């Protein structure tokens, strides 16, 4: 997720249309598989930290058209994102040239992409610190789908669009 895909303008928060546009994904791709990826789908290749790496991180278009979607977010989430953006700006200013700005919402302290394993580790630490039941990160998506089905009275089509599932049976 990049900041240009997040709308948390004061107007969008006030009128309830704050949103995140899902149109990019971070993926670790094997160097040999990179050749078979359609180059038009690759938006950015992140510099490698080591020449010995057998894979590379890329920002690319999602694999299916149904994966591209707009997700509306509540004002509380929009305000959290605003706060996080300000924190990133302060870090960037303090580090100067040491910070590489890739415009990423989830970036480490130097601006580099945060991969799934790091996000999962942070979630696990948060769970442990707060004595919460253990969950896997992906289960949050399923919980969200269940909650949205309840909110919409079982409207599978609208939940399908929100979740990015290509077929209603997948919801």
Regions found by a protein language model. Name each.
Residues 2-90:
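Conserved tyrosine-mediated DNA breakage-rejoining catalytic core shared by Y-recombinases
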Residues 5-16, 134, 153-171:
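Short, polar N-cap/turn motifs at the start of nucleic acid-interacting alpha helices
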Residues 59-68, 107-115, 131-139, 150:
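Short, contiguous acidic/charged loop-to-helix segments that flank catalytic cores in large enzymes
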Residues 72, 76, 114-121:
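A generic alpha-helix signature
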Residues 88-101:
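Short helix/loop segment immediately N-terminal to the Walker
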Residues 118-129, 139-167:
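C-terminal catalytic core of tyrosine-transesterase DNA break-rejoin enzymes
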């Amino acid at each position: 997720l990049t900041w240009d895909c997040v709308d948390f303008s004061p107007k969008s928060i006030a009128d309830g249309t704050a949103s995140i546009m899902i149109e990019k994904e971070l993926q670790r791709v094997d160097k040999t598989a990179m050749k078979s990826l359609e180059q038009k789908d690759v938006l950015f290749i992140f510099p490698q930290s080591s020449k010995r790496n057998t894979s590379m991180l890329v920002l690319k278009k999602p694999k299916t058209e149904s994966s591209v979607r707009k997700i509306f977010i509540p004002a509380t989430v929009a305000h959290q994102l605003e706060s996080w953006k300000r924190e990133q700006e302060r870090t960037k200013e303090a580090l100067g040239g040491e910070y590489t700005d890739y415009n990423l919402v989830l970036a480490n302290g130097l601006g580099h992409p945060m991969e799934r394993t790091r996000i999962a580790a942070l979630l696990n630490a948060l769970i442990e610190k707060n004595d919460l039941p253990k969950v896997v990160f992906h289960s949050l998506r399923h919980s969200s789908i269940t909650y949205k089905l309840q909110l919409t009275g079982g409207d599978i089509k609208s939940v399908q669009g929100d979740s990015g599932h290509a077929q209603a049976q997948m919801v």
